[in-house]
Amino acid sequence: MSSLKIHALADVQSKNIGEGTQVWQFAIILEGAQIGKNCNINCHTFIENSVKIGDRVTVKSGVFIWDGIEIANDVFLGPN
């Protein structure tokens, strides 16, 4: 049984999302994005194709992450 939780109103095109990660409503994650284990992707976020996100990362509401960005483990990304 998977511990991955994706809200019904999220648009998640990627299959590369780790166990224990939660994706909230209105998040958009494009097909090529890679997201690690136990992450928290909040509402109204946008994650492009070549983004790589490590384990235990929190992406708060309203954060956009563009192609080419790599985020290490244990990072907190807050809005402006």
Where are the regions a protein language model picked out?
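Structural signal for interior beta-strand "rungs" in well-ordered beta-sheet cores
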Residues: 4-78
